[in-house]
Amino acid sequence: MSSTTDATPTPSGVNGGDSMTVNLNQFYNNGDVAWILTSTALVFIMIPGVGFFYSGLARRRSAISMLFLSMMSVAIVAFQWFFWGYSLTFSHEGGPYIGSLANFGLRQTLGRPSSGASSVPDILFCVFQGMFAAITPALAIGAAADRGRMFPCMVFMFLWTSIVYDPIAFWTWNPNGWLNKLGSYDFAGGSPVHISSGMAALAYSIVIGKRCDHGTTKYRPHNVPHVVLGTVFLWFGWFGFNGGSSAAANMRGVMAVVVTHLAASVGGIVWCVIDFAKNRHWSVVGFCEGAVAGLVAITPGSGFVPPWAAVVIGALGAVFCYAATYLKKIIRVDDALDIFAEHGVGGMVGNILTALFAADYIEALDGSGTAYTGGWITHHYIQLGYQLADTVSCAAYSFAVSCALLFVMNYIPGLSLRVSREDEVLGLDKIELGESAYYYKDSTDEPPPITTSGVQYTSPTVSDSASNEKEQEHRAQNEAQKEEEYRAESEAQAPAI
């Protein structure tokens, strides 16, 4: 996070500024405020983007559940962020590990400059960062695909955000946080968002267990257009995710947008080339996976690295994330949607490469006049140690606490993580939500006969219980046949995940 203002309104009372006697707008640049508001909307659109991305990758029977959980993350974390999340993460007081409850219920956040970015008021920075907090559990919860109950997922979102995301974000972005004081670089969330969600997804996959037919069935994306749509939403929103992390309308934010676009583009190309070399055909899903890998990898360094470095980071991010998709076979974990590979490994790669390619002249684009050091390319070699400390500590903390939380939840009545085997076969959409992503018109209706005179005749029919039973039986057989045909077609055409 970056800031570029000298104005410091004095808070008074519980509002953080008396708007009845002081024009609080005078302390902030309207352009900065407009850009962060726009970035907030851009980051919001990423959350349904995650839902569509996961919905397309998941099975047809779990498509709606992925969309449902992504939107529930928005609502649940919005309340958590208002209740105490923002205060725990960005309060002006606190030790090196967690903030205070001084801003509980958004007290003293009206006109006071944020601790995370003094260029904007607390209330604006709160809603912007609230979108970061909301998307992180949405990323992690995809690990429940095809077998996770909805209610425990929602409880997990609230608790995990409070005890995992908030502390890691505090360490990283709050001036009192120990990683911030150490000097680690994380412009937009390599550790708080991607490493933490990737490790949480790995923990969820381990605790919830494998899908019932894991190892006997090749899983295929059920809806490639949904994957593409989700990627478009993510790519579009990521401009605000990284660009808005400048916390001001300045050249550093512009550079963050430029390197974000480059890394995504190169990541998509490299993943496609790897897919083609391996399978001898191009893959739309592969391009989308690669673009997301590039976006994840560039996130921590987006406000630190020059454009040429973004090309390298996007390419290496795609290579390492692609290789990481095979880790789940080695460690025998059913990471259904490759969340650990994309976000956990991608975030780690981005953190390390930021130490190598950070440039002091890119940091100076915010115009704040702060003394900058850069990374290896500017001979600041200790930065690699700082980035390693950041990466290891955040990954270990997220994984350990997520495992403990999920283990305890799984033994609490009503919070068991997994549906029964029978319900898993029927699908989460039907069992947990009572809805389906796709409704097919039954093919039992026969067209009316046409006579030689061209007149159509229809015969009246009498419905009774016997005919209804036959119709229901025929409908069930028809649906089963469509399911088999769909699976065969998917296995023949779509790339494996």
Curated annotation (Swiss-Prot):
Annotated membrane topology: Multi-pass membrane protein
Extracellular-side positions: 1-32, 85-122, 172-187, 245-253, 303, 360-394
Keyword terms, alphabetized: Ammonia transport, Membrane, Transmembrane, Transmembrane helix, Transport
BP term (GO), one: ammonium transmembrane transport
Transmembrane regions listed in the UniProt entry: 33-53, 64-84, 123-143, 151-171, 188-208, 224-244, 254-274, 282-302, 304-324, 339-359, 395-415
Main location: membrane
Compositionally biased intervals (Basic and acidic residues): 467-490
Biased composition (Polar residues): 451-466
KW Transmembrane (keyword) present: yes
Single GO MF annotation: ammonium channel activity
Any GO CC annotation of this UniProt entry: plasma membrane
Region (Disordered) location: 440-497
Compartments where located: Membrane
Cytoplasmic side: 54-63, 144-150, 209-223, 275-281, 325-338, 416-497
Top-rank lineage group of the source organism: Eukaryota
Biological role stated in the UniProt entry: Transporter for ammonium to use as a nitrogen source. Under ammonium limitation acts as an ammonium sensor, generating a signal that leads to pseudohyphal growth.
Family from the record: Belongs to the ammonia transporter channel (TC 1.A.11.2) family.
Protein name: Ammonium transporter 1
Gene symbol of the encoding locus: amt1
